[in-house]
Amino acid sequence: MKANDIKKGNVVEYNGGIYQIRDIERSSPQGRGGNVRFRFIMYSVPGGVKTDASFDADDNLPEVELLRRQSTFSYKDGEAFVFMDDEDFTPYTLDADVIGTDAGYITDGLTGIYVQVIDEQPVAVQLPQTVTLEVVETPPELKGGTATKRPKPAKLNTGMEIMVPEYITNGERVLVNTTTGEFAGRAD
């Protein structure tokens, strides 16, 4: 798979090891004919050793085939997250550092999660496109605020903060895009 096609969460082979991509920085230097470079922050699977590497857009990194198991978030065990396989009820435990910032989207009983498994070991989670979270704290709407589309900060039930439209109030359930971390609409 070419470096410019790789997304966060992909698992690739690099230097004889298997790594999961956690962060991507794209840079296009002006002086070198505009060759786009990608800097990947990746962690070894299993083990979680951090590696930082840069690639040209057309560099090839072989993608590793993983087993994806549809699961439901079950509970938190200390700092670890436990997911239950929807088919055979196998529990998959992932440490908080593997979950990373995605922890802000995970609520009790969240469904539609895929746990990525290599050699019977869970290595990552793939969240649904949107999740429903509750607004626990946001400033009140200003009078006449409907004429403008100013966003305001809102704290969600998972502790995460996002910007929401002015008409959203405390206690409302909102959809949040798990890729961008942005407000995606009201939940029913």
Swiss-Prot record:
InterPro entries from the UniProt entry: Elong-fact-P_C, NA-bd_OB-fold, Rib_uL2_dom2, Transl_elong_fac_P/YeiP, Transl_elong_KOW-like, Transl_elong_p-like_YeiP, Transl_elong_P/YeiP_cen, Transl_elong_P/YeiP_CS
CDD domains from the UniProt entry: S1_EF-P_repeat_1, S1_EF-P_repeat_2
Biological-process GO terms, alphabetical: peptide biosynthetic process
Source domain of life: Bacteria
SUPFAM superfamilies: Nucleic acid-binding proteins (SSF50249), Translation proteins SH3-like domain (SSF50104)
GO molecular function: translation elongation factor activity
CC per GO annotation: cytoplasm
Family: Belongs to the elongation factor P family.
The name this protein goes by in its record: Elongation factor P-like protein
